[in-house]
Structures are given as C-alpha cells and as structure tokens.
A protein has these predicted regions:
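Extended non-transmembrane interhelical loops and adjacent amphipathic helices
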Residues: 1-23, 111-154, 216-259, 331-344, ...
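An intracellular "coupling" helix at the cytosolic face of ABC transporter transmembrane type-1 domains
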Residues: 31-34, 146-156, 208, 212-215, ...
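Transmembrane helix-loop-helix hairpins at lipid-water interfaces of multipass membrane proteins
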Residues: 38-98, 174-206, 280-307
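Hydrophobic patch in the ABC ATPase nucleotide-binding domain
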Residues: 130, 343-346, 479-486
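ABC-type nucleotide-binding domain
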Residues: 355-613
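Cytosolic ends of transmembrane helices, especially the final helix of ABC transmembrane type-1 domains
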Residues: 241, 285, 303-343
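Membrane-integrated ABC transporters
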Residues: 1-51, 69-84, 102-106, 123, ...
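Alpha-helical transmembrane segments of polytopic integral membrane proteins
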Residues: 22, 55-62, 118-122, 135, ...
Length: 613
C-alpha cells in the first residue's frame, strides 16, 4: 500500500511540475486571438450547466408520468408533464446551437493559434545564431516544435476548456447525488482513478518514445525527400537508387510502427483492466440504489435520476481526469516548444554598441583569429591574421577546407571567433551593432539561394530597403553580366524562376549564379564579398565578368574567395591559405616568381585546363 501511494504521489508531482506551462500557453493563445478565446470559454461554461438541467428535468418528467400511469391518460393528468417536456426540448435545442457555435469558434481560434505559433517558430529560426544549424540537436528541437508543438497549445487549451466544462457539470451532479448518500460521489471518483493513472503513465511513455524517435523520424523524412525531390530525381534514375532508398525508408518506418504498436497494445490492456475496476464500483452503487427503490425509500423518478446522474457523473469524472491526462501529455510536448523559443543567441550586441561606419577608411583586419565550428573538433582557423586595405580587391585562394569560407562568416558576424578579433577600421566587430555590420557588406554565398520568384523580385531581395525601381534592377543585371540571360526569358524581368510553381522557368547553375550576382550588386554596400563567384561560369563568361568587376569594385572594398587562379589573378593582392593559416601573400606575378605553393598550383591548373605552363 505505501508503495502504491508513493507511485501515485510521484505521478501527481510530475503533473504539478508542468503547471507553469499552462499560463504560458494561455498567454500564447490570448496573444493570438483574445476575443475568440473569451467567447469560446463562455460558451464552454454555459454548456457545462445544460446537462444538469437535463437530468433534473428528466426526474420531473418521470415523477409527473407516475399519476398518468395510475389514473389514465386524461388531459388533467397529462398536462403537468408538458411543462418539463417543453423545457427539456428547449434545453436540448439551446445545447445544439451552443455546440455548433462553439465548434465554429473553436475552428477559427485553432487557425489563428496555429498561425501565431508558426510565426513564433519562424521568427526564432531566423533570429538564432547560424551556429545552431551546425548541431543535429537543433534540428531535433525544430522538428518537434514544427510537427508537434505547433498544434499542442490549442490542444492544451481544449483540455483546459473541457476541464472547466466538465468540472461545472460534475459539481452539479455531485450535488444531485449527495441527497442519496455521501459515499456516492466518492465512489464515482474512485471508479475513474485507475483509468486516470493508466493514462498518465502511458502519456509519459509516449512522450519519452517521441524524444527517442525524433532522429529516426527525421531520417525517414530525409529518405522521403530524396525519393520525391526534383534536385535528386535525375541521379536516382541514373544510378538506379530508387529501390535502395525505398528500402531504407521502409526499414525506418517499420521500426517506428512496431514501437508505436507496442505502446498502443500495452495501453489498451491497461485501460481494459482499469475499466473492469470501474465497472465493479458502478455495479455496487446501482444494486444499492435498486434495493432502496424496492424498499420504497426512493421513487422511480429518483431511480431514473440516479442512473442518469451517476452514469453521466462517472463519464464526466472520467472525461475530466482524461482531460487532465491529455493536458499533462500536451504540456510535455509544449516543453519542447518553449525550450525552442527560449534558445539564446551568442552573437549579441554590447549594451552600448557602436554604430558601424558608412564607408571604410582603413580597411578590414583579422588579428590572430582562431575558430572551430560548434560540435567539431577540427580547427577551421588557427592564429589567423590578414589585412584587407580599404578600396582594394583582395583574393583568398586555397584547397577545399582551408578555411576560406569561414572568413566570410566571421566577417559578416554570423559567428564570433573563439580567440582574436575581426576589425573594421580598427574597431572590433563585437563592439558594433550587428545589423549595421551586416548592412556594410553584400555577399554572394558559395551556394546562393534559388528563390522561386520573378527575376526582378530575385534581384530586389538583395536590398529590400532600397527602391526597387526598373533602373536599379537593370543596373544590377548589367553589372552581373546577366542581360543576355534575362532577354532570352519569356517575360524578361517578370519571368517566374524555378519549378516550384506553375509557369516557372528553370535556369542552369551558371545562370542562377548570374542572378545571384545581380542580387549582390543591387545591395550598394561598401564591402563586396564573393565566395566562388565564377565557379559555375565557363572561361569566356568568367573573363568577361572579371573585366567588368574591376570597374564595378572601384571605390569599394572587395574580398574574393576562390579556388580558380584565373579569378584570383585579377586581385590587387592574393593570400594563399592552408589548414587555417596564410602561407603566402603577394600579387600574381610576385607569387609566381616565388615558386611556392601558389606557383605550383597555378602550373597544375593551367596544365589541367590545357593552357600550357
């Protein structure tokens, strides 16, 4: 017995530990739709009183029918039954109208709450540091927030609404039953407790399983994406990989189905045992009430009222405790949502951050910078120093993994260095306002985003604060050397790009890169950062664009990250990186004359391109 009490106490402690989520959830719902929330709660409260009226009127109808059965169905005898029957019909009609209205209000409220939660998730996913995207744990959190917690607040609100409605009705039913014996309400509650604790136990098991199942479920979604995405369609057919990934998908889904079925089976067996316990209590109470009726201690109306009140009360108590159990379950999942929404940013501004300069006077410097990506033991930069003079074109070359792209992320303050500092005009980036630092630069990433929008919209995204006039867009197209591409499109700048939506036109990788370049140039920032800007261009297009670029970069500071020496040779100064350090620096001819790593790599690249030594 003490062991059972301790188990019950432990389960109740788990429930109470989740109570802080309730006000936070109610605040979320209130912020999403305050008026709809109040309306829905009022409707639930009124509906909670109607069953009591129905039960009470049933007793009046039965008692008024007894004289009719004894004396005959004359108008004088039947008349007293019409009033309670009419009132019962009115109550049922009002109940139906309220249920329909509450359903409509609930549907509207649900849409508003889900959209509000989705907006919070979107805002947080944009606000958090890029470092989180290097951690698988972040994607597990995001997965649960997107596909579980996004609708759980509404479910919890429904649980609380059901608890309110059932509590009101149950209190009234208890008041009705008290006249027949104080022990009846206690028996009613006791009969539902086994099912309640079964529900709590299995909801906790389900939640723990969901935590463990997040990674396999995400893997199944990945296989699903591989099998259905446009990006993978050609290679899956060429390499005949469809059956392989279908088999991998089925293996993961089979594992998840088996685990879920076992949970459902265990819960079903436990619920059956709990129902048997409740049935014994119900049978005992019913036999006691029938015995009292046979002893003429209660009327037939009382017996009818008892059966209705006890059965409904038992159902209400069970529903109330089930709502508590569901609220417990939903609160467990809401912990994931609130944990996701509480993620801290590490790239933060100082309390009195300095404004970033509108233009560079001295330049950019990396001073003994060391950095490794979150969750990685590999050092990306080690004691790295580099100077980029204002108004110059600087190229950084090196092997894949040398740390070139890491420079871009640190300079844009997407990450902060573990040691050392990145400075603009001698001021550490961490002392400046983050948004203003990022306004200083325009970046072409190594893998630019292919937005499913029109050409003009794609380019205008480079600077939404600027006026997206036709002249501005045309200038950016010209600077990127994309005039011919846009001219060939069916509707020019108004052509929808990509195949996500009907009527879209797809581009080659090189053409997409030109559109991304135009987007970068549309942002009139004093610092231009280009990460592999010509990687998808043929040699003729590369030479044409590089000739234009020297003109475009005048009075601006440019940093080019590249593995193509034909691109690097146009820079004022070239830095060669290897294993997170600069190993050579100089102009193109100067580095060739040194005969070091740059000269050796240049010769290899020229021979590979068939251009001689």
């Amino acid at each position: 017995m003490p062991g059972s009490l301790n188990l019950i106490a432990a389960k109740l402690r788990r429930v109470f530990a989740l109570l802080p989520y309730f006000p936070r959830t109610l605040a979320l719902v209130r912020d999403a739709a305050p008026g709809w929330t109040v309306t829905w709660v009022v409707l639930l409260a009124v509906q909670g009183l109607l069953p009591v009226a129905t039960v009470t009127l049933t007793r009046s109808v039965v008692d008024s029918l007894v004289p009719v059965l004894r004396r005959g169905a004359t108008w004088q005898n039947v008349w007293p039954t019409l009033l309670p029957l009419g009132l019962m019909a009115a109550v049922l009609l009002v109940g139906g109208v309220l249920r329909s209205t509450a359903g409509w209000v609930r549907s509207s409220l649900s849409e508003l709450v889900q959209d509000h939660i989705r907006a919070l998730i979107h805002r947080k996913s944009v606000e958090v540091d890029l470092a989180y995207y290097d951690l698988p744990e972040y994607f597990d959190h995001l997965h649960r927030a997107q596909h579980e917690a996004s609708y759980r607040p509404m479910m919890l609100l429904e649980n609380l609404g059901s608890m309110l409605q059932h509590s009101i009705t149950l209190v009234a039913m208890v008041a009705v039953l008290l006249r027949y014996g104080v022990w009846l309400p206690a028996a009613l509650v006791v009969s539902t407790l086994p099912a309640f604790f079964v529900l709590l136990h299995h909801r906790l098991r389900l939640y723990r399983w969901r935590l463990l199942a997040t990674a396999p479920e995400r893997r199944s979604w990945y296989y699903d994406w591989l099998l259905t995405a446009r990006q993978t369609a050609a290679e899956l057919r060429l390499l005949d990989l469809g059956a392989h990934f279908q088999s991998a998908y089925e293996a993961v889904r089979s594992q998840l189905r088996g685990e879920r079925r076992k949970l459902a089976r265990d819960q079903g067996l436990a619920e059956a045992a709990a129902s048997a316990c409740g049935l014994l209590v119900t049978a005992g109470a019913a036999l006691w009430m029938v015995w009292r009726t046979t002893q003429q201690q209660t009327s037939l109306g009382d017996l009818a009222l008892f059966f209705q009140a006890f059965n409904q009360g038992q159902g209400l108590a069970g529903s109330l405790l089930a709502s508590v159990g569901e609220a417990y379950s939903n609160s467990l999942f809401l912990g994931d949502l609130f944990e996701f929404l509480s993620l801290d940013r590490k790239v933060v501004e100082q309390e009195r951050a300095l404004p970033a300069p509108s233009a560079l006077g001295q330049g950019i410097s990396f001073d003994k910078v060391s950095f490794r990506y979150p969750g990685s033991n590999r050092v990306a930069l080690q004691d790295f120093s580099l100077a980029i003079p204002a108004g110059s074109i600087t190229a950084v070359v090196g092997r894949n993994g040398a740390g070139k792209s890491t420079l871009v992320k640190l300079l844009c303050r997407l990450y902060d260095p573990d040691a050392g500092s990145v400075r603009i005009d001698g001021v550490d980036l961490r002392q400046m306002r983050v948004r203003e630092v990022r306004r200083l630069v325009t970046v072409l990433m190594q893998e630019p985003v292919q937005y499913s929008a029109t050409v003009a919209e794609n380019i205008a995204l480079g600077d939404l604060a600027a006026s997206p006039g036709p002249g501005v867009i045309e200038n950016a197209i010209g600077e990127a050397g994309a005039e011919e591409i846009v001219t060939r499109l069916p509707e020019g700048q108004k052509t929808l790009l990509g195949k996500w939506f009907a009527g879209g036109t797809d581009l080659s990788v090189g053409e997409w890169q030109r559109i991304a370049l135009a987007r970068a140039f549309q942002r009139r920032a004093p610092v231009i950062i280009l990460d592999e800007p010509t990687s998808a261009m043929d040699p003729w297009a590369e030479a044409d664009w590089l000739t234009r670029f020297r003109t475009l970069a005048q009075r601006r500071t440019a940093l080019i990250i590249t593995h193509r020496f034909t691109t690097a040779m146009y820079a004022d100064r070239i830095h060669v990186m290897d294993e997170g350090r600069v190993i050579e620096s100089g102009g193109h001819q100067e580095l060739l004359a040194k005969g070091g790593a740059y000269a050796l790599a240049w010769q290899r690249q020229m021979r590979a391109g068939g251009l001689g030594s």
